[in-house]
């Protein structure tokens, strides 16, 4: 077998592989000898079929098997012998001419094919001792815990039907039909809808006009959708809602006690407070971790500048761009609404894709050198977490992970990345800094605003932008969730 390099430009490689017809003939004869005593052909005793007849009957099918085996097995062997790793699966090209193909299968012509691929760039790791980051630390006060527990209590409070007029804080149960220009519109109708007056859940003006209604009342409400309402067909439009009030209920007292905890399935009020404190710590910890990670990745980005495989960048960019367009379509907005243009947005996301690929390769190299591994238990827990997100689809999800090799990689990549970050935190200079809740959130909001000005509408998963959330190359798409119930048009939470 001859292996001839025909292209070596940057990271691009093209290899021509030639297997002489005689070698193919020899391999075929070996296979024919193996099957000689096993096949049954009319007119011949077992093991007595002439070689020429065997070749005539089975030659082409055996050669086709050999060709498939060579194409399946040799690319990885060739790359290994060259000391190369391909960024993606090599592209394989062979003759499409029928006459040439027939000659190859008849062992009358050399079998040739071409491998085209990009190699992963060599990365010489640098010392991370110079990386300095600040870890923001927050002390969670008892008052903040109590405030959150009160919100839990309010959401779990009981309501009791009353006969009087509805006031702010009361919960009404209603049917409604929304119309624009006299025509009903999608999402504008509901039955048995519950609304706490004064909650601000519905569009401005809707709740105010229900103050004073009683059970059994019929009322037509006129409101105007906000100019920035996500559904462009409704934004700025005047609408009427025919409302039929079914029930008015007054709120019960909000008390933090063991009875409340029991209602929530928790043993005591003290335990409820512990759980809420843990949730707050987790939320702040997640935000602190994200900002800490961003600092590390920003500095790694400055340290490493090298050519990235176009195939990986294109795959990353296409994933981001697809999500960006989906987000725009769902929100009914355009690039102009986001104070940018499609051209500028493409440039921004191309840069983001390059950064993510480059950082992914760097983190991969750091992790490999440090011996970072994702354990089977960690993979199983991650897959279980995925199953919990798709109730009723557990079997399909498990089958997806079994049948799609890339699916497991998509689960492994973020776990591996976080473990590499954990490793780096033991190697770099980390300074803890106490901050208030307001300082932490104010800084985060400031960063978000700055991001919005310089980039196009953000992809929720991909546009961690400067955080880079660097994945390891192309990841398999996860199974889609079942669509969530649509928000009603009057409901402000739809925004």
Swiss-Prot record:
InterPro entries recorded: PPIase_dom_sf, PPIase_FKBP_dom, Trig_fac, Trigger_fac_C, Trigger_fac_C_sf, Trigger_fac_ribosome-bd_bac, Trigger_fac_ribosome-bd_sf, Trigger_fact/SurA_dom_sf
**Pfam families associated with the record:** FKBP_C, Trigger_C, Trigger_N
Gene Ontology CC terms, in alphabetical order? cytoplasm
Q: Which Gene3D superfamilies match?
A: 3.10.50.40, Trigger factor ribosome-binding domain, Trigger factor, C-terminal domain
Instruction: Provide the alphabetized UniProt keywords.
Output: Cell cycle, Cell division, Chaperone, Cytoplasm, Isomerase, Rotamase
Specify where it is mainly localized: cytoplasm
Region of interest (Disordered), residue spans: 78-97, 441-495
Q: Some GO term, biological process aspect, for this entry: which one?
A: chaperone-mediated protein folding
The compartments listed are:
Cytoplasm
**Which portions of this protein are annotated as coiled-coil regions?**
none
Q: What is its EC number?
A: 5.2.1.8
Describe the reaction catalysed, as an equation: [protein]-peptidylproline (omega=180) = [protein]-peptidylproline (omega=0)
User: Per the record's keyword annotation, is Acyltransferase included, yes or no?
Assistant: no
List membrane-spanning regions: none
Q: Which residues form the PPIase FKBP-type domain?
A: 169-254
Q: Any idea which GO molecular function terms this record carries?
A: peptidyl-prolyl cis-trans isomerase activity; protein folding chaperone; ribosome binding
Q: Indicate the enzyme's highest-level EC class.
A: isomerase
Q: Which domain of life does this protein belong to?
A: Bacteria
Record's function text: Involved in protein export. Acts as a chaperone by maintaining the newly synthesized protein in an open conformation. Functions as a peptidyl-prolyl cis-trans isomerase.
- What family is reported? Belongs to the FKBP-type PPIase family. Tig subfamily.
Q: What is known of its domains?
A: Consists of 3 domains; the N-terminus binds the ribosome, the middle domain has PPIase activity, while the C-terminus has intrinsic chaperone activity on its own.
Q: What is this protein called?
A: Trigger factor
Biological source species: Rhizobium leguminosarum bv. trifolii (strain WSM2304)
